[in-house]
Structure formats: structure tokens, C-alpha cells
Amino acid sequence: MGTYLKNYSDDEFSVAGEKPEVEFMDYQNDDTLQDYASEDGPVIVTVPFPFEDGKPKSVLVGETSTDTISIENTSSESVTLWSVRIFSSNPENSYVLSMMRPPLNDANEEAKQDFLGLTSVEDRSLLPGHTLTIWLSCMPKDIGLHTSIVHVDIGDEKIERVAFLLADDNISKALLSEEPYSRRRGQNKKFEPAPIVPGCRPTRQHAQGFKYKLPQFAIPAHIRELIESKQRPDVLSEELSMINYAQFFSTLLVMEELNLEEEMRAYDMEGVSMRRRGRNFLSLEVPGLAERRPSLVQGDFIVARYARNDSRPYQGFIHKVEADEIFLQFDNQFHLNHHDRNQYHVSFTYNRVNMRRLYKSIHEAEFLGPDILFPCQSPCRALKRWPFKPLNPHINTEQADAVAMILGCRGVPPYVIYGPPGTGKTMTIIEAILQLYTAKKKAHILICAASNTAADHVLEKLLLASYLIRPSDIFRLNAQSRQYEDVNSDFIRFCFFEDRVFKCPPLQALLQYKIVISTYMSSSLLLAEGIRRGHFTHIFLDEAGQASEPEAMVPLSGLCGRNTVVVLAGDPMQLGPVVYSKQAEKDGLGISYLQRLLFDFEPYETGNPNYVTKLVRNYRCHPAILELPSELFYGGELIACKEDEASPAYDCIGLPNKSFPVLFVGIQGCDEREGTNPSWFNRIEVSKVVSIIRNLTKGGTVSEADIGVITPYRQQVAKIKKALEAFEMPDLKVGSVEQFQGQEREVIIISTVRSTVKHNEFDKFFNLGFLSNYKRFNVAITRAKSLLVIVGNPHIITKDRHWDRLLRYCADNGSYQGCPLPPPESYSYSDETKYDEDQGGPAGWDYNQEATSYNCNQEATSYNCNQEPSDSGYRGDNDAKSAATNNRTKWSEELPEDENQPFNNAEADPEEEMPKQRVKEGAEQGDVQPNDQCSTNDDQVHDAYPAKYTFPPGWCDISGIPASGWD
């Protein structure tokens, strides 16, 4: 019950350290703070406010919470109690000692006035067998963790007790969960391979017959065995080259696919029942489905077996998804034999079509040659700037240079537009497309984007110049899996569909379009329909930094000819490819094609204008918002062109420094999970975020649509949305960093969630959240135009060098509010995340450019980029993340908690194409049977059951690598 420390002063043994100040005690990371060993001594001191289920007791702001400290003399002699006192409290003076019970919250004023609080109890004699009871009370004035350290000096002993309370308000209290977290276990049962009895697919899944079928690319058995045994294929130790290109990326894709299989197996269920729904359907309840754990949509299928024996597996297609239920259609005999009392073992699957497209793209990439894959091996080129008259009068010098170079390009190598946040990448692409369309009558242009949202955004911008483009020349290609209702009504006329189901038009119709807009994956439908290599004179890859190299090769490998001009636009310092296998990400799948070009090949690395243009003028952010990311990631080169003007939002939240609209609100909350949902939330931060939003929108000063909330965890998104429902704020967007990439808001509020070192180290090890991922950090803090507010625990934030820089940046400019700041020297940066200290993009960028004139605000101004590059930026994010080996197994059991784990994208906005949707996009097309009966397509059945994967002849034929090449 207590710990004795003899003849020590307070500061020599206190958990508060040398000063009587409570900075931050991480009770979630240190189980000993309230876990006192039994004492051999004569005096026993109880612990006030003991934890409840491992967490501090909750108390409402403004209400008094009390508990006792009992000091019992178990010896046969009297002992002298020198003092009992509060050594330290956080917030300061938030706790009170007393010899009398504090008045209840509903007590009258007289009782409250009669209460006598003490700073200490001194000089008392405690008789043998007697117990002294002292009251410790706290009435919180604000939400968050309240901590107190009490010292008991008795005889020649000193005993310390630490008290914790978590202060809630009505908002955070309403988000309390009564269901403790317990990890849901999936089935681990192994079944002998058996032919799957096919089910009946939904009507909308019957696709057109494509001219060219997609090969299966089944995973070779020996490669599966090698990777599943945790052995590293030799090819991954080789330097990437034309010779091993297909083998190298095929291996990485196999690693990725095996990871996807494993993740889906975690959701398998044993001994479950189904209910008959009407004549044709059986329904299955899937726990976590509402949170998309797993994420299932119409057209997916499950595999079911009777639980009573090792029976044949049956394929059941999903025809409808409702809350936690899926409606399934199996083989007719399965429905006839079904009884509601039957029990089944269920396995979830994912559709392999997009993975097969990726395999195909890298195997065919060899036809592109070194000009695309390894530009350093191609002859140097000298482009002639093509003279043109800007159609958009607002494009700047660098944007005009990029357009002139693109117009002057004659085929490969690719041209790169390196565009940091808010510098107008899309504007540059749109200008180039319009110039090509109007000046080059034979131009056929393909524009690919990383998501449906991004592709629609390109279409939207093109339509602003509709007076220049004939509507019949534009086509927006959609995957069949995309819901008709998700498409903006203004865009429907540019799409091709039948019965509200999107399709790819016939070849002759495709050939007539001058501008085709697609996602990376859907572009494969063009090849499947018969479009040949070289048809497109120009291929634009927008947001190329978000696409893995195999994804970038989907449009390039089959459609890019020798004379095709390829243009990549993106920023390698922002979000990279979505990769689920951490080993595959580390070995190269996490490096985008754009990043490889910029960092590995001298013409791009040195900023040669014949190969690359870097945009440096930011029109989005207030200069104070832009300054830190510019210094950290872009060598201080970015130029803020947004006018520095005060926003009415500044007064709404009491911004301390009106000329510095970056505010850090420090708060000590609590990391929590509930039920079987492994995603994290912090209800204290939710309340603070909602409070800030209410202040901003009070009186209509700031509209809901002008505010965005970024937070890394799905459950935090859900909790914030739930809290906002009470205040009727449907237009306010809350989402992950990925959902805000390419977007902006006048006001951005960031909720970091993490309040314990232990969970932050977990994120750091697996590169989750955004407290350990500098690319997510960069995107998060560059979405705001006028005001950026960060809500988080400063003691956790400071463990990462980037977030610590942001914290100190705010504090140094007098823009910090909340709990006490940690001193600058209190934490060293973790060595567990190793960063490359090369700064500001490609190492060869010349930051000492000569002064140039440019019209930022419609007036002639000048700027000078003669700034030294910072030494704290990074060239890549694929360095190995090391951590304590003994934590690896424990942590890996918790992996599905992250916002970006596969198939777990709950709360995503309907229009957003999240990672799972990337895997699924168009998954029903290119290899299905165009009939209306139950599918007997062996390819589909083959895909449904991983154990049937074989090594068919021709697996590597397309790349010229024989089967033995995998050894």
C-alpha cells in the first residue's frame, strides 16, 4: 500500500522531479504510479482516487470530487506525523486538503463557507492502532487530467501518493463508453482445399465483354512459401534495374497481397448463423461492419462452410449491405438446405482484379524502356520553350515555364511538375491541357488521378473553361463499382452508363474523345477495350506522389508510346502510396515513381528545367502558417503570396497573437477504445474541438463549410461527428489527413488524440497515426488558409521533432494556451524513428536563385530566394523504423487499430476513394461473364480461395522472366 523513503528531501524522491511542479505523469505508460507495494513498516497510507478499470475517475467540471487518505498506525508505539501536504498539483491549486468532509455539490452557501481547506496537516501524534482520515478534494475548472502529489512525513519516513482525476464536461461525459475494449478474435481454423460452389452475383456485376482479358497472375506457391516463412527474396537485395524490374516489383506486390489476405482472415468467423430473407437471400450479421471492419460492398463475396463437418465451401455474393448485416445469394442447393439453426464457418475475401492489374502493369513496363523507367540511361534533352498566350491570366512565372516546356516536349522522358502545397499544380495542369487542346488538333490527352474525388476535381476545373472545349470531346471514365449516386449531377453527361451502371464505351467511341479523365486503376479499362499504345499523345499523372510505382505503370505500361509526352505532377513531401505491408513499403513499394525520379536521377535531382519545374509560390496559406513547413520540407523556398489580413475568426477564439494565426491548445486527455473496435479516441480532445468550433461559428462569424477537422483515428472522427450532431453542423467536414489531401479550409483544427508515450511509440513503430509520419504532418498543417488550431498533449507532441518544432513555434510567438508546457530540454527525440537529414526535396535543388520579379498581389513586387536550405527536412520516408524487439509481438496483435489499415475505412465521406476502394475500384470488370445466371466462371472461383493459387504456365512469360527467375 505504500513506499517508504527514509531521510530524503521532497525533490530527491518525488515523481515530480526536482521542482514541486507536476508537468506530465503518463499513468497509461507507468503502471507504478498508483501501484504501491505492501509495506513492512508500521504506517499504512491509502491511495486517494484509485483508478477505475485502469483509468482515472471521471468528475464533471464545476463539481467537487472528494476522497480520503487514511493513515493507519499498525505498530505498538505512537508515531509523530510531522506533516501531510500537497507537494504539487496540476493545474496549480486544483486540489485541497481538509480535516473535514468537503460540502456536497448541492450544499447551501453557509456549509460551503464553513468549509476550511488546508495546505497541510502538521505536528500530530498517531496512537497505536489509530487511523487518521484526511480529505482530498478537487473542483475542476476545465476539462482534462488533474493530478496531485501528496507527501506524508511521519517519523523518519516519507511517503508519497499520487492522485489522478479526469475532468469531463457534458460533451465528453456523453462520449464515455460503458463497454470496455476487448480484441475480437478471428478464426484460425485451416481447411483442406476444395472446389468452391459458385454463388449468384448481383445483376449490376454483369459487365460487358472486354476485348482483352486480364490474366490471373496467381501467386507462385514457392514465392508464397518463401514470404510466409519471413524470408526475404534475394531480388529485393539487388539494385533496381531494367533486368530485374518486373521481378522486383512482382515480389513486392506478392508481399502486399499476402498481407491483404492475412488482414481479411482476421475477420473470419466460426459457428455463426444466417437468417432467411425473402425467397432469394440469406443475411449474415457481421460485427464491426458499420465501422467498415471489415469493409464490404455489393459485389464482394464470402466463403461459407457448414460448421458440423469439413464440407465444401460455398461462395456467397453480397447483394446488399445494411448496417451490420449483409444480404447474400449462394448456390440454389445451399438455399434449399438452409435452416436458421444451421451454423457456418465464414471466410471473408477480397477481389484480386486490381492486384492483377498491378502485376500486369509492371510486367508490361519493360516495353517502356529506360527512357521512362531509368531516364539517366537515355540521352540528355534540351527542350525549346513553346511560345503561348496564357488562357488563365493568373498563372505565374514558374507555372508558365512548366506549360511552355510541356508544349515543347517530344515524347519521353517524363516531365515533372514538383508542386508543394497550395502552389497551383492543378492550375498548371489545366492550363497545359487547354493549350494542347486548342493548339494541337491531333492531341489525345489522358489525365489520371489517384482518386475519384481528384479526378472529378480535374473535370470540374476543365469545365470552368467550357467555352474552349466541346462537351463531346471530354469523357469521364468510371469504374463499374462506383455508385451512380456518388457522381455530381453536373458530371453525369460526361460519363457512359447503362441502367445507372457505369461502363466503358465501345472502342470507336473511345477513339473520338480528345480528353479522357480516369483514376490510375480505371485506366486499365481503356486497354481492355482495345485502345493501343501511342493513341494518347499526352498522359498526365496528377498527384503522382500518392501512387505506388506499379499504380503509375497501369496507365503508362499499356498506353504510353515512344512519342507520348508523360507529365507527372505531385509532391514527394506529401502523402505517399497507401501500402499495407510494412515490409513491402520499406523495401520500395512505399516509394512513388515521382519520388524515384526526383531523388535518383541527376536531371530531376538538380532541377534541370528540361525535366522538371518546381512551383514555389503558395496562394493558400497565411505567411505564418506557411513558414514552418517551408523551412522543414522545402528549404525555406516557398513564397507566401496570400495577403496577410486579419480574420474575424481570430477574435472568436481569443487568439493571443492576432498577427500569428497558429494556435496550440494544450490538453491532457486520455487514450481510449471501446467494445471490439480497436480504433482510438480521446473524448477530452473532442470536447475541446467542439468548443472551439462553437466559438468560431457563433453569430455566423465563420461558416461550417469553412472549417475542417483533421484527426488520425476513425473513432475520433466518429466521436467528433456525434458531438457535432447535437449542434446541427452537418456541413462541417471531419476526416483523416488522406481525406483532406488536395483540399483547403479557412480554418483547420487538428486533434492529435495521443496522450500517452506507449501508444505513440506503437504508432511510431508501425508508422501509423500522424505524430510519427512527417508526410501526414506536412499535409495536415498546410490545409489551413487563415487559421490553424492544434489540440493535443504537448508532452506527447514534443517526442517528435516536427511536432516539437510546431509547439515551440507557437510558444515562441505567444500563441499557446492550456496545460503547462514541457521545458525544451525535457525530452530528447526518439531514436526509434530514423530520419534522413537531407532537406528540401532533391538534394541538388539550387536554393540560391537569383532575384526574380513576379506579380503576387497584382502589383509589381520582387522576391529573393537566397536562403540557405534547412537541415531538418527529409528526402524519403522508407528508412527502417526500429523499436524494442520485445514489443514487436505485443504491438503486432493490435495492428488493425490504425486509420489506414486495410479494409477499415469507416466514416469516410461517400465521395472519397479510400484505400480499400482503390483495391476494389472496377474489380468486377474485365473478367466476368456477361450473362444473367449464377456465375460458373472458374477465374472468379479461383480468386475466391487462396489455397487454390497455383503457378500456371505463362505467369512470367509476359516479362520474359522464366519461372526459375523467382528463385
Q: At which residue positions do the language-model features occur?
A:
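ASCE P-loop NTPase motor cores of helicases and related translocases
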Residues: L116, F327-S518, Y634-G700, A705, ...
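Short, charged beta-turn/beta-strand-edge "cap" motif at the junction between a beta-strand
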Residues: C138-D142, A307-S311, S523, V753-R754
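Pre-ATPase regulatory/linker segments immediately N-terminal to the P-loop/RecA-like helicase/translocase core
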Residues: T147, H151, G155, L165-S283, ...
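Conserved helicase motor core of SF1/SF2 NTP-dependent helicases
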Residues: A439-K442, S451, M521-S524, G530-Q849, ...
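Asparagine/serine/threonine-enriched low-complexity, disordered tracts
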Residues: D846-N848, N855-N857, N864-N866, N886-N887, ...
